[in-house]
Amino acid sequence: MKIASSLTIACWIVTAAAAWAQDAQSVVDRISNHSAVRNAQQFVDSDHDRVIREIIAINEVAAPPFKESERAKLFAQMLRETGLQGVEIDPEGNVLGLRKGTGSGPLVAIAAHLDTVFPEGTDVRVKREGNRLLGPGVGDNSRSLAVLLSIIRALDEAKVQTTGDILFIGDVGEEGPGDLRGMRYLFQKGRYKDRIRMFVSVDGAGSGSDIVNGALGSRRYHVVFRGPGGHSYGAFGLVNPTYAMAKAIDRLSKISVPSTPRTTYNVGVVGGGTSVNSIPNEVWMDVDLRSESPQQLHKLAEEFIKQMNSAADDENRARSTNQGKISVEAKVIGERPSGITAVDSPIVKLAAAAVNKFGFSPTYSVGSTDSNLPISLGVPAITVDSGGSGGRAHALDEWINVEKTNSVRGINLVMTTLLALSGVQ
């Protein structure tokens, strides 16, 4: 009886999912055939040269981690120039602008992050070679910011009336050390925190066929090993924090983790010491732990801390502690929640239907993006590409291809997805 019941439920779920997929496609088809939406898509084509100019202008205002303010001011001004009303920069540094709908639909937020991974002083000038734009951050995420601007202009030019309000956002703190601080403020303290019903992050160049519906969780540590230190010759035989850290790294490298759900670890940066002929007082490392599963991430973090302490204990047993012992301190410097927006949820089905409409087959993936935060809070969220193509993200020779056909198609795909979520009058 239980087996039959389970099979019945399973069949119902499959049938319901298939029915919803068909319904989502009909929604997207209807929106795509709307005369105002067709006019908006034609405007995007005519607006493309301006998009390229704006990509360059945005990119050439540096936005290192925690220093996005100048780019935020520029983007806020660009939003105002589209005619968007009530543009503001919130206390965390996010740029916000609301496009009002009829009030009968959900509030949909669409965001592109302002910050880059590149430190202050990086040459962020853009070089153009034919259809290629080259410059650090040009694809991640200057293009996406320019795409939001083009979508606003297109909707206004074509007089597209959405049922739901659309909140356009240029947010801070998406990249590494930022630890999603812009999203944390938006969803935990910002004035729209209880109103956002769906969230779309536009991040990176690409055709738009991939839908990031999984949030890759991470926990990052700054680990410090301390000891008494001393002269390399005169104090030889004392405990050495470098040896303890080396043992810790070796122990970390031997921790077994599952391939599904994918779980990883990495020692990314090491430092410490004062001179070649000194036993250091202090050495440190920065460690990145990641998993698609909250449970696996927690399990890995517990094992990691255990091995750090064990490595310090081993060094204290191996050498003299008459001047002091090795101690270890692991401080969390970043934490991103994990989770998933189900493939059969309305937001994913509508995004997939839009992908189909533009001649692609949707794929689904897991990533560490602005969507992590809303997903963890139960807000339906996805991350999509901004169109075109590109490569070498996070490298000084980062590039995007702004060939018009693929670039415009990608912008219109993002816009269609957005309109499917907000609804069109």
Describe the function of each predicted region.
Residues 1-9:
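Bacterial N-terminal signal peptides that target proteins for export
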Residues 8-16:
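Bacterial N-terminal signal peptides
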Residues 20-64, 212-217:
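N-terminal hydrophobic or amphipathic helices/low-complexity stretches enriched
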Residues 22-39, 56, 242-425:
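Metal-dependent amide/peptide-bond hydrolase catalytic core
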Residues 53-106:
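A non-catalytic alpha/beta surface segment that caps or lines the substrate-entry region
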Residues 98-143:
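Catalytic-core environment of secreted peptidases
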Residues 115-128, 200, 212-224:
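Acidic-glycine-rich active-site phosphate/pyrophosphate-binding loop
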Residues 132, 137-216, 258, 277:
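Acidic/histidine-rich catalytic neighborhood of metal-dependent amide-processing enzymes
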